[in-house]
Amino acid sequence: MYPLLTNSEIESLSNILGATETGLTGREITRILQLCIIPDNNQGLTKRIRLFNSFAEKANSDQNSDCVYSFIKEAMMPARWLSNTQAEQKMRIQINEVLALKGLQLNDSNEFINIEIATTVSEAKQRPRFAAASEAEPAQKNTWA
């Protein structure tokens, strides 16, 4: 399992993934939720609330946050962003700011890597930009208690 996310962290990630300008479309969200086997019982709500409710329901049921990490990996697949690399870069930076609070970063190869845990907002905002993939070890599932 990956590190457990708090409700605030899940909400922040939902806001990023469902953002109007740089986030995913409603169709993309539907498809990725299906691919990740995350229940989608929130049709008709805003993208952000829909994602938060779906993530929270699945995470509570599974007693872990792996569904959120799976969704992020699927959403950030490089092939999805070939026609909009600026939006991808912005979204990856914002996602990594939240993940830095858990000592993780999603690198350009779409793999979670371990970084030093950020404990402040300023660290969380700086850490993803400066963590070198060559210095970090790949994050492994089932290594956190």
What are these regions (language model features)?
Residues 105-145:
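Charged alpha-helical initiation segments
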